[in-house]
């Protein structure tokens, strides 16, 4: 029995041309009806109702058809882009997706560079294309961490012209942080991947002066692979502890706060992933939510407390980190497992006052409130009190991100009767912002969010369209799940399914398939040695979960010991420097005493020192 062959692409170039250029009204209705049938067929192949799983799902074919269908004008284009965004958000990671992912990346970049960038105004289709591009490169970066992009050098080279055009288009999106943040993520991802796989800087020729804040200096060009930072590693460990209900969670969260200063370091792509993974854990656990909010609070207050790291008002990616956080905390507000988690993400941990008072915005002439948390309403008051025409980019981008996500939250809550109080509070907050805020950048956030959603109507009037996604609901969970299997692999589960050739004869059951051995050391993680057989023989053989808990505890202890050794070394260096400074001060003080003694007594001897002449007497 031959394997099932999927049909060739239903959407052809001729169909797209006829759909976009027909003037006959009857023919236009026929083509529109045919296009709607294509969308129904694509929805089934994408598995939108089953999170991309099922025998009827064939993602490579469906993704290609949808990106072709997105070239049709009007409602079909919007429907196709919404379907593609939802699919890229929720499907699991599989190596067989890589060729089609690169095809999607090239198609999206081509549409942006050759069509969208040439338009005088910003269109909702352009926003959707950027969001889709962000999800594509986010998935490519996860595959890169697994070491699966070695055979795709030609695909990477094909992206170079579009990446150059994207690089030059960045300044035109300065007023739109939601778009600029995604574009910078795409460019940084491409830069890191190309430096590792192609061994050259993508934008090196475009920089006249070396960027002191470049985040590609930490990329390893040897066989040991890309090295993730401690913040990302421990965030994945925290998510694993929450999923398996392991007792090491508090210790892992302590490690995360120990490495909180890494949010200010150069590898900001790892920091963004760390926030994304920790945000998924925060949807399930209050301690993780508190750690996530503490990280951002420290990040925003770091100029006042950190001397060894650059001020966040000086580093170019700080606004990207802040905007990404506003999206993550908004997702926690909407999709957290309990009402307490959702309420805390919205108003913070303080319960000593009426939540309605948090909606009040601080007047510019009043005393600026201190930052006492990183909930949505706390950040809203903090940013709104500090915004001005010449304020730091971090301030107005953070304010923009809060307002932008509040609009999307109010739209997402349409028709949800169980969350009337929550929706009412979000709506009242937005109304106060519209009445109070006169800054055009913040007013622009409301307009852009409504344009992205294709809806500026009353959020209480109707339910949201089922296929239009305001937030990426599943990609964080997929990434956390995949990275946890990569960082903490079990004996019987692989991090990602291996790409296997298609067999033409399914009846050959006894055929032995030859696979290339997996490459080790993609991510450098130091593990402790296994205990000896003699130690294990004295006790009953532990089950899988006991062994997993023990192994995770050993890994955490190992990293904690390394952190403590590093801290001791730093303290020893500081103590030695302090002793040296004290000795230097004492030496200078003694010299001053001797000068005063010589000036007053005309003697050069030390105090209480007997001269030879005095000895003779």
Swiss-Prot record:
Cellular component terms per the entry's GO annotation: membrane; outer dense fiber
Listed GO biological process terms: cell projection organization; flagellated sperm motility; maintenance of protein complex location; spermatid cytoplasm removal during spermiation of flagellated sperm; spermatogenesis
Bilayer-crossing regions: 129-149
InterPro entries assigned: TMEM232
Coiled-coil residues: 567-604
Bilayer disposition of the protein: Single-pass membrane protein
Major localization class: membrane
The keyword Lipid metabolism is assigned to this record: no
Domain of life the protein comes from: Eukaryota
Pfam families referenced in this protein's UniProt entry, alphabetically: TMEM232
Subcellular location: Membrane
Function: Plays a critical role for male fertility and sperm motility by regulating sperm cytoplasm removal and maintaining axoneme integrity.
Name of the featured protein: Transmembrane protein 232
Source organism: Rattus norvegicus
Gene behind this protein: Tmem232
């Amino acid at each position: 029995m031959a394997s099932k062959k999927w049909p060739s692409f239903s959407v052809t170039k001729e169909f797209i041309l006829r759909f976009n250029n027909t003037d006959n009204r009857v023919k236009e209705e026929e083509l529109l009806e045919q296009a709607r049938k294509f969308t129904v067929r694509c929805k089934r192949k994408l598995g939108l109702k089953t999170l991309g799983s099922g025998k009827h799902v064939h993602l490579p074919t469906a993704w290609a058809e949808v990106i072709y269908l997105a070239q049709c004008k009007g409602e079909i284009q919007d429907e196709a882009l919404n379907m593609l965004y939802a699919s890229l958000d929720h499907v699991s990671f599989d190596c067989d997706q890589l060729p089609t992912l690169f095809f999607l990346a090239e198609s999206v970049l081509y549409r942006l560079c050759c069509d969208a960038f040439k338009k005088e105004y910003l269109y909702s289709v352009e926003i959707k294309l950027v969001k889709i591009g962000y999800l594509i490169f986010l998935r490519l970066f996860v595959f890169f961490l697994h070491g699966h992009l070695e055979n795709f050098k030609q695909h990477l080279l094909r992206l170079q012209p579009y990446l150059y055009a994207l690089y030059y288009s960045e300044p035109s999106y300065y007023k739109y942080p939601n778009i600029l943040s995604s574009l910078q993520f795409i460019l940084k991802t491409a830069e890191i991947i190309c430096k590792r796989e192609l061994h050259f800087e993508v934008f090196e020729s475009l920089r006249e002066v070396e960027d002191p804040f470049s985040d590609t200096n930490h990329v390893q060009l040897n066989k040991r692979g890309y090295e993730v930072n401690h913040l990302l590693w421990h965030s994945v460990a925290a998510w694993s502890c929450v999923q398996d209900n392991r007792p090491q969670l508090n210790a892992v969260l302590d490690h995360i706060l120990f490495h909180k200063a890494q949010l200010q370091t150069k590898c900001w792509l790892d920091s963004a992933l760390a926030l994304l993974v920790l945000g998924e854990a925060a949807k399930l656990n209050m301690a993780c939510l508190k750690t996530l909010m503490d990280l951002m609070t420290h990040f925003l207050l770091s100029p006042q407390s950190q001397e060894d790291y650059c001020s966040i008002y000086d580093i170019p990616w700080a606004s990207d980190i802040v905007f990404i956080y506003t999206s993550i905390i908004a997702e926690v507000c909407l999709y957290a497992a309990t009402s307490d988690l959702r309420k805390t993400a919205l108003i913070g941990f303080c319960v000593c006052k009426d939540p309605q008072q948090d909606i009040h915005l601080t007047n510019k002439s009043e005393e600026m409130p201190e930052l006492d948390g990183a909930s949505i309403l706390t950040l809203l008051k903090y940013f709104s009190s500090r915004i001005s025409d010449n304020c730091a980019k971090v301030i107005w981008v953070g304010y923009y991100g809060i307002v932008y996500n509040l609009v999307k939250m109010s739209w997402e809550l349409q028709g949800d009767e169980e969350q009337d109080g929550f929706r009412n509070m979000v709506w009242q907050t937005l109304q106060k912002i519209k009445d109070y805020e006169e800054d055009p950048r913040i007013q622009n956030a409301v307009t852009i969010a409504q344009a992205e959603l294709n809806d500026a109507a009353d959020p209480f009037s109707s339910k949201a369209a089922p296929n239009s996604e305001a937030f990426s609901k599943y990609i964080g969970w997929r990434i956390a799940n995949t990275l946890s299997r990569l960082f903490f692999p079990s004996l019987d589960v692989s991090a990602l399914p291996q790409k296997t050739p298609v067999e033409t004869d399914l009846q050959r059951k006894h055929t032995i398939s030859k696979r290339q051995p997996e490459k080790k050391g993609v991510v450098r993680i130091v593990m402790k040695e296994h205990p000896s057989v003699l130690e294990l023989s004295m006790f009953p053989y532990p089950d899988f979960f006991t062994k997993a808990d023990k192994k995770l505890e050993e890994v955490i202890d190992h990293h904690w010991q390394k952190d403590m050794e590093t801290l001791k070394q730093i303290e020893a260096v500081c103590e030695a420097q302090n002793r040296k400074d004290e000795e230097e001060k004492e030496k200078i003080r003694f010299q001053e005493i001797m000068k005063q003694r010589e000036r007053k007594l005309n003697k050069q001897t030390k105090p209480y020192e007997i001269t030879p002449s005095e000895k003779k007497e």
